[in-house]
Amino acid sequence: MTLDAFTAFCKSLAHSTYVCQWGGSHVWKIGGKVYVIAGDSGGVMDRVSFKVTPIAFDFLKSQPGCQGAPHLASRGMKWIQRTTDEAMSDAELLTYIRDSYRLVAAGLTKKLQKELGLAATELPPKAARR
């Protein structure tokens, strides 16, 4: 996936904000909370980390081209890092990024969700967020 395609997708998610931090990582947030972190090499994404459900974490961490996200999964958080495209297509990656956005948005305070205009029907059920 190109950096331009990744950026366009993240920009399309309501209230997403961008910051370049941690040594040049492309970090996208909702309500001030990170939902995806990516690195690129020459405009091509070479690693992408995103939040997942516990079931997706257990499945993806054993797939070629995926691992628990460094500095996040080691703290018990359910974050996966895709290091190559052999584990999933770009379309599947975008689905996981959208799911990560929804999981992080669901964890925001009710007040902030309301301020951002996030409808409860757009967010995953509480049980799926753990």
Predicted regions and their residues:
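Charge-dense, helix-prone N-terminal extensions
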Residues: M1-R130
